[in-house]
Amino acid sequence: MTLNQLLQKLEATSPILQANFGIERESLRVDRQGQLVHTPHPSCLGARSFHPYIQTDFCEFQMELITPVAKSTTEARRFLGAITDVAGRSIATDEVLWPLSMPPRLKAEEIQVAQLENDFERHYRNYLAEKYGTKLQAISGIHYNMELGKDLVEALFQESDQTDMIAFKNALYLKLAQNYLRYRWVITYLFGASPIAEQGFFDQEVPEPMRSFRNSDHGYVNKEEIQVSFVSLEDYVSAIETYIEQGDLIAEKEFYSAVRFRGQKVNRSFLDKGITYLEFRNFDLNPFERIGISQTTMDTVHLLILAFLWLDSPENVDQALAQGHALNEKIALSHPLEPLPSEAKTQDIVTALDQLVQHFGLGDYHQDLVKQVKAAFADPNQTLSAQLLPYIKDKSLAEFALNKALAYHDYDWTAHYALKGYEEMELSTQMLLFDAIQKGIHFEILDEQDQFLKLWHQDHVEYVKNGNMTSKDNYVVPLAMANKTVTKKILADAGFPVPSGDEFTSLEEGLAYYPLIKDKQIVVKPKSTNFGLGISIFQEPASLDNYQKALEIAFAEDTSVLVEEFIPGTEYRFFILDGRCEAVLLRVAANVIGDGKHTIRELVAQKNANPLRGRDHRSPLEIIELGDIEQLMLAQQGYTPDDILPEGKKVNLRRNSNISTGGDSIDVTETMDSSYQELAAAMATSMGAWACGVDLIIPDETQIATKENPHCTCIELNFNPSMYMHTYCAEGPGQAITTKILDKLFPEIVAGQT
């Protein structure tokens, strides 16, 4: 079967860039002095027996981060960024991830084999340590996984003379593997980033700096007698099987090639079931990137892989691959500033890249990537290894690496309430995703704008919307809670205290009600909104003008409005999950405190500069507005936004204390009497709610609550209650909620970890 010139036959509009990607990144855990740590793999990261994203490689201190399959290089890096964020915040606070492929100074006896549950995996690692030595096992890197797109493969298949898709794909990936190994020196030259080994790593003197220790024969390679042919897939499979039968290899995965066929559990299955994708294993960690690989590297490699497919297969495969290995070794061992040797035929690569880009009409971005490759071929200063040279001090990169590691650690802990790369999603959803990754629960974002997730563990699948809307809630429950009239009736029928009031469907009806409430404290609010939108509170009798404004604000949010009695006391939010109170929050209304110098408008701007404040529930605290509601509140207190407040004078900008309207959060879970927590849970249960926010007004929290004498009033139940405000509070310890959501959804994971 010949595949030469097949790519050239495709239409220019063919989906040439269609592919699936995955990244595996290895990194060592070190302390803040750059020394290897001897702590076990973090227990908060769940069980390594099933964790899909965070594993240990050879050493107990060597983390392996694994992305799910992504449809683009950008999404693959986004996955890796999030997993790196989780890993960085799951290790001990005095630990960081080493950003280099080559380890810091170490002794062989320091290296502890990963303490895995699987007997074979432990035995396998002990075998490797005995055979290859332990120091080499501490070398880390990046594995770049790629599957050609389904439509692209189908288009190539249609252009071929083949009738068997599995055989065709096998031939396609075999050709790609052959040319990748033939030209692997290109990867080493451009992206090699392990120019030195720290003192004591090798027993003998090794010339340095070089382009890549890891990608030379000084790195992690098989014994010289292991020679596997890539002439055919059958030859490849049979050779490895023979080495295992002879005892030269213990398992198929002990064959360490720069490229590995993937998609089946055993190699022989490739012959009848087919190769699914390729794993390219010869990438050094890029220490200039927090996640170890840049976007331009990902996309340049993608182009190079397609160029290898564009090029013809070698006529003599074994000879071409042997020459490619020798050339790679020469380039890996050469000084980072040494030009490419004459036998490195860069023109073949450049021509293939140019023709590929031209044939498929790729845009400026990909054209610029090709220009960068050409420039690096001409000038080794532009290669990654050369860029590391200025940071070598006394034949060591330890100081540079530690500074980078600490900087990346600090970045992980910046805005630690968010999940890196997913900041545009709701904060509660980000927190749930963080915990899902940490626990080892598979995830897929079904609709990012709608905050809709698919979570699964083995065959157990759960769908989650907005952080806590799940199959555990009956469909009608959130509909009932969205309707405040229905909520009040259900609670009242169950014997729980609710405020009295009336409902109106027009401004005229509401205004006609004014004579009945003109001398009363009242609350005006929309019938069916959440997050405190459109609510006005009058602790003093409202004038007709202010009452009308409050009605207009409420009607702007809904077609029906409630006017209720104002209940004096302190408002608390109780978070109820599955019949149990998990958190209690005191919310202080949006406010500013004067300094005698600045206007209220300026004080609001100062308070909004707090990095914890943001918009759309993506930060623990919300931006304070100066809209109609806030200005009405100021007017009731005799102020305008441009007035200067006296020093120490506190002015509230809202009557309602919702965090979503700029309030402050104070965690009082540990001090709130359990009787109120139990009463709030009973209210949620009466609604049939699984996850529910219960808002209680409590005049005196020292009084013990009972159903007969509740000493409180329920002013609202909230479906899809915010979780972040309970965890990241303005004051108090905070309560983790999202992890409890996951524990309830996947109790088998909790059971498996105890």
Curated annotation (Swiss-Prot):
Gene3D superfamilies: 3.30.590.20, ATP-grasp fold, B domain (3.30.470.20). Pathway: Sulfur metabolism; glutathione biosynthesis; glutathione from L-cysteine and L-glutamate: step 1/2; Sulfur metabolism; glutathione biosynthesis; glutathione from L-cysteine and L-glutamate: step 2/2. Mg(2+) 1 binds at D695, E716. Pfam families: ATP-grasp_6, Glu_cys_ligase. The keyword DNA repair does not apply. Residues 1-332 are annotated as: Glutamate--cysteine ligase. Transmembrane segments: none annotated. Mn(2+) 1 binds at D695, E716. Residues 488-746 form the ATP-grasp domain. GO terms for molecular function: ATP binding; glutamate-cysteine ligase activity; glutathione synthase activity; metal ion binding. Mn(2+) 2 binds at E716, N718. In the N-terminal section; belongs to the glutamate--cysteine ligase type 1 family. Type 2 subfamily. Monomer. Synthesizes glutathione from L-glutamate and L-cysteine via gamma-L-glutamyl-L-cysteine. This is Glutathione biosynthesis bifunctional protein GshAB. It comes from Streptococcus thermophilus (strain CNRZ 1066). The gene is gshAB.
